[in-house]
Amino acid sequence: MVNLGEQMIYKTGDVTKATETGLKFLPHIVNCYGVAGSGVVCAIEKMERNPIQQYRNWYKQRYYEQQIFGTDVVRDIHFELGEVQFVESGEFIVCNMVAQKWQEEVNCKQVPAIRLWALQECMERVAEQIKLLDNFSCLVCPKFGSMRAGANWDRDIVPLIENIWKDFDIIIYEY
């Protein structure tokens, strides 16, 4: 059963060491170039089954087979903006959300690396997967998208969380 707690709590600490009980989804943003090595990725890389290496493999192969939770259905997930790779790691399901491209300059203005349309699609995919599980506990998240990716946490990310993940308990970890 999905936990309909409808609350967002902020904590200080390492999101990969979240102490909440039960199955936790850990969504974070990855880029569409297969490059990772800073921020929360450094902690996720040390987790069981190395979700970051799985992301790099997904990038190299350009697709992977993902079993849809709670079903026998297997779907090919192509590596592109807006897609999510789900990697089980102990009590976590790490969600590698492809929502970032290099910064660009358009009409002499810097465009942030984050692609909010892609992040929205990723977050919707995460919500769909959560709803298929009856042992889901909560989402434990870093402040994704608001540092190197260039989004404003309060203006850009929080409204997406409140809209798409409104039915779930969410713990935001600030490191």
Segments (PLM) and residue ranges:
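Macrodomain-like recognition of ADP-ribose-binding/processing modules
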Residues: 1-175
